[in-house]
Amino acid sequence: DSNPDAGVIYFESESAITKQMVIDRGIDPQRMVMFPVTTVQEFRTQAIKVLDKYLEQNEADRKPIMLCLDSMGMLSTTKEIDDTADGKETRDMTRAQVLKAAFRVLTLKLGRAKVPMVVTNHTYDVVGSMFPTKEMGGGSGLKYAASSIVDLSKKKEKDGTEVIGNIVHCKNHK
């Protein structure tokens, strides 16, 4: 709210956000553009197009923007979609490489444009270690490209047996 000209470019892969939800949370929908994305390649292409258009503007005329990807963990690859359509049961071993390449390019463009980006992702438990740890899905590309990594977890806050809210725990990893 401190900058009424600022906006958010929201890449949405879960089909979980609607315009009404945005309005219900008190967010001006005129300041938010939602792009539905299905694959890593589609996200990469759309994000690069947005950043290229932004960089074409005179720096003094640029309105502040922020990019958001919700959720990286839900993005498929074109190979995975093609394999599924063909009835193949093979795992897509190219996903981590495609993600790493996408964020290698995006990180440079985001830095040049001075545009922050927030990415949500899933975590999983690393099996086989003496002290179990959480790891982000999708390979190491995002881990190395990120300026900050914050793990969020939640548990229900109860009053007796009635759930009255959530307790959110934040752990800064990087």
Listing of model-derived features with the role each one plays in the protein:
Residues 3-101:
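Conserved inter-motif catalytic segment of the P-loop NTP-binding fold
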Residues 92-174:
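Phosphate-binding/switch region of NTP-binding enzymes
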Residues 1-4, 147-149:
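Alpha-helix C-terminal capping segments
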